[in-house]
Amino acid sequence: METVLKNDCSHCQESVILRENGGAGRSSNTGIQHDIICVGFGPAALAIAIAMRDRGIQRRVRFLERQPEFGWHTGMLLPGSKMQISFIKDLATIRNPRSHFTFLNYLHQKDRLVHFTNLSTHLPFREEFNDYMKWCASHFNDWVQYNQEVLSVTAVESTPGRPAEYFKLISRDVRSGELRELSANHIIVASGGEPAIPPILSTQHLPKTVIHSSTYLGSVHHLLQEKNGSYRFAVVGGGQSAVEISEDIQSRYANSKVTLVTKASALKPSDDSPFVNEIFDPSSVDKFYSLDHSARQQTLLENKATNYGVVRLPLLESVYEKLYRQKFLEPNPAKWPFRLVTGREVMGLKELPNNQIELQLKDTLSGRVESSAEVYDLVILATGYTRNPIATMLKPLEQIVEAPADGKTYCTDRDYRLRFRQGKVKRDAGIWLQGCCESSHGLSDSLLSILAVRSSELLDSILASSKRAEDHARL
């Protein structure tokens, strides 16, 4: 049941806000409808839902997801692309190999287990792993509301001047624009990353022919519809996504020309050797968190080659082979279907009258800025993601969040709980952050590797924080 309220804020655009009523089992604290609200329903949130189901944890829980259905990096589910981690690091196995929600049980349910075994691989196709997660998500439709974008989270004081007792969220239906108000004692922010646009471009309106890699699959066919068209593409970035997109373009558009632009001096291989991979073990989080700020920064820099701006070696070797073959088949570089431009940073762009794009490129050694040698029909920014919820939905809490001395806008405890200033929020209410704690919890924070274990750690923390008299739930 919902109550329709008018937003009577005199300096705001008038809108209708729907306030959810808690119904049966409502908390005795006035206005609190849910025990847990999770913002987002991607892999991190899904792992939490699975852990709750596996452990039999009964809570009034709601997941709010802005997408119309579950999807994992749908803009980058390139045909034939494979996972970069073992299927054993799924959403449940490391925590509980007997869970209904393991990847192996998914294969069993889909009658593909034996056939998958015949592949002799630990690396499923990304399309299949996405389907596995969609299968998991289908078990929680009663917990999830899709098409809901959370706009803000505020702390609510029942008594002015006293610590806040719970949190209020405002979400917007992305289809109708309708606003909804919800409340809970415990908030989990697992909304994923936002596309990172190079700073020099983020201040200007980007033409429709400049897209981020996150929307690649959904955009490329819409923008460039002729499969045999002689299109020119620029892909900006030097990591796995940038190279994969460059390869995919050439398979989709046989007559295309692709230029891969990276500010690095060369494409570099990722380090996925066994000893280095131990930094993604769940137990490594404790060690990393115990370090001081300087040691954390040093460790992140030292292990950067595992995850950022790097390419898996087989793909890198394939690209080099392709470049070499071009050279002996055609001595004129202007006729090559694929070019690699290193040591160049995008400093700006110009939209031409025919919707083509000219890039302004800076030589990273000399500092000289020049226009690109070609103009492009489509520019794809494979420039990663940014994660800072304090700058978006949690901004109303900015004044009561404890800010660390290292210049960050927030800090978290080992259990991923956002730290508030003393006396601002009661201990039996809290906010937990997922996927945006790399600087305090290590490189694995935004990856799939530790989701199964981390989800259970987070639930332990939430259950331990709840001290309401009527809530005696145990693990």
Swiss-Prot record:
Cofactor details (free text): Binds 1 FAD per subunit.
Enzymatic reactions: L-ornithine + NADPH + O2 = N(5)-hydroxy-L-ornithine + NADP(+) + H2O; L-ornithine + NADH + O2 = N(5)-hydroxy-L-ornithine + NAD(+) + H2O
GO BP: biosynthetic process; intracellular iron ion homeostasis
Disruption phenotype: Results in poor growth under low iron conditions and loss of siderophore production. Also leads to a significant growth defect in human and murine macrophages and attenuation in the mouse model of infection.
EC numbers on record: 1.14.13.196
Amino-acid positions noted as binding NADP(+) in the UniProt annotation, renumbered to this chain: 238-241, 307-309
Keyword line: FAD, Flavoprotein, Monooxygenase, NADP, Oxidoreductase
Cofactor entry: FAD
Binding-site residues for substrate, renumbered to this chain: 89, 277-280, 307, 449
InterPro entries: FAD/NAD-bd_sf (IPR036188), Lys/Orn_oxygenase (IPR025700)
Molecular function as annotated in GO: ornithine N5-monooxygenase activity
Top EC class of this enzyme: oxidoreductase
Induction statement: Expression is induced during iron deprivation. Also induced in response to reactive nitrogen species. Expression is regulated by the transcription factor SRE1.
UniProt key word Cell membrane: no
Entry annotated with the keyword Nuclease: no
Amino acids binding FAD: 65-73, 84, 150, 446-448
Pathways involved: Siderophore biosynthesis
PANTHER family, A to Z: L-ORNITHINE N(5)-MONOOXYGENASE, MONOOXYGENASE
Family in the record: Belongs to the lysine N(6)-hydroxylase/L-ornithine N(5)-oxygenase family.
Subunit and interaction comment: Homotetramer.
Protein name: L-ornithine N(5)-monooxygenase
Native source organism of the sequence: Ajellomyces capsulatus (Darling's disease fungus)
The organism's taxonomic lineage, starting at the top: Eukaryota, Fungi, Dikarya, Ascomycota, Pezizomycotina
